[in-house]
Structure formats: C-alpha cells, structure tokens
Amino acid sequence: MEQLCKRYVHTPAAFIQNIVANTKRTTLATQLSVEKAKKKVPKTALKKKLNSRPKERLPNWLKLNDVFNIHYEKPSNSDINKVNRFFNKAKVEFEWCAASFDDIPENPFLNKKSHKDILKDHGECGTTLIDTLPEVIFLGGTNVGKSSILNNITTSHVSRDLGSLARVSKTTGFTKTLNCYNVGNRLRMIDSPGYGFNSSKEQGKVTLQYLLERKQLVRCFLLLAGDKEINNTDNMIIQYIHEHGVPFEVVFTKMDKVKDLNKFKKKVMSSGLMDLPTLPRLVLTNSLTSSTSPKRFGIDLLRYVIFQSCGLIL
C-alpha cells in the first residue's frame, strides 16, 4: 500500500518536471530562432530595399565624355562633389553689360552701393581678390543654348527650374551685349552675343576684342549644338581662337536631341578638333530635361573644367 501511494505521489511530480524541462528547451529553441531571425531581417530587408530602388538611367552619349577626353585625367567623385557644392550654393550677381570693349568697367564694384558693402566686408584683401577674379567666356552661334547653359551651371543639378539668371529666349540672337556674372566672388562668367544669323558687326567686334585684349580671360568655352552640323562660321571661330592662342574648350549642347551617335562621332572626328595641338577638352551636355535625358547630364563635368581653368581646383 505504501509503495502504491509512492507511485501515485512521485509519478505526477516526475511528469511535471519532464514537462517543465521540455518547455524550457522549447522556449530556448524558440528564443534562439527568433534571435536568429532578427539578425537576418535587417540584411534581407535592406537587400530588398536596395533592389527595389530604381536605377538611374544614363544616356548613351554620356560615355563619350570619357572617350573624347582620354588624354585628360578623369576628375574624382570628391572633386566633382566639391565643385557642385560650390556652384549650388554660390551667390550669383549680374555685374555689367557692354556693347563695346571700352564699355567694360575696370572696377564694376566701385560704382554700386552693394558692391561697396562687399568690399567693406572683405577689407583690403577682399578688394584685391575681387578685382583679379578669373573670367571665362561662353561663345557660340545664335540660339545654341548659351544662356541655358549658364543657368544650368549656376543652379542646383537636380532642379528642373532653371531660374532667370540669364534670360532664356527662343528668339535667335537674344543676347545683344557682353553680360558679366560674378559667381561667389571666385570667378566671372561672360555671356557673349551669338554669332551668325541676326548678329551684327558690332557684336562680333566686341567679342573678338574681348578675346584678344581681356587680361582676366582664362578660358573660352565654344558651344556647338550636338544635333547640328559644324558650319563654316563655327570653323572660322575655331581657327581664329586657335591661331591667336586663346585657350578654349568645346561644349556640345542639346545632346539629348542627337538621334545617331555614330554619325555624331564621325562628325567630331572629321572636324579636326581632335587633331589640334592644344587638344581642347570636349564636354557633352543636355541643357534641358526630356524623356531621354531626365537630368542635366554633363553639367558637373563642365563645372569642374571651369573651376580647373580658373585655377580653383586644389
């Protein structure tokens, strides 16, 4: 009887202990599984998130910036980012316009109250820096997109609103004078009258005189429409600035409108640009956004070349 009682007394206890032990093991296994799952979730989620992010679509013509400039060192991403930050944040001011070379003021700041304030803020050192700013000029045929390029350079890379720094017009030859813009008190950009149709002799004279006599000029950027042929006037300008030793680069605009890239490459190779001893850099851009070019590609490289031309790349 005593043994029978012991049997009924101890059996439930052992049974309960067994259940508790199994429960602990099950709980521990579950916790380990949960912990393991938690560790995997972030990586899996991150991977899915990265894979779900749409890839940026790059136009095929953009690769030609590397192909045509193989003799130049490709700028680092760090340098590109620094230059982009400068242009995106720099204050841009219209300084002067000139219909003749004699109209170009030697000290444009001294005649304006706002500019006097700038000089006062910077002191004597600031005056020296401002008065010796390097200048780059943009040259091109009528309606080639000079003003649009200026807006692209001086506004945010991702912005579709190009602003009104340099007025854009569909009327050919809109820019009638040399227009000067101060960019962050580090450099000046000059927008010139377009040559060709609807241009005047006076406009051509002031531009050519500026190219030959302006001491502050460090680089000329010749703009050619990518979707058009290089005409006789373009070739005359190229020959002129080359023979007179004016340092220049070539910017192809409206590349998003180029339908046949092979034909475009043949055009460039047969133009003689690649054979010039000075070997100008060729920069391909699209100044306006479209379905084929949703961003303004090539502008970051153009900004870098401008900065480099002005001796501002450290």
UniProtKB/Swiss-Prot annotation:
CC per GO annotation: matrix side of mitochondrial inner membrane; mitochondrion
Domain EngB-type G: start-end pairs: 132-312
Residues binding GTP: 140-147, 173-177, 191-194, 253-256, 290-292
Binding site for Mg(2+): 147, 175
Cofactor(s) needed for function: Mg(2+)
Superkingdom of source: Eukaryota
Function: Component of MIOREX complexes, large expressome-like assemblies of ribosomes with factors involved in all the steps of post-transcriptional gene expression.
Protein known as: MIOREX complex component 8
Species classification: Eukaryota, Fungi, Dikarya, Ascomycota, Saccharomycotina
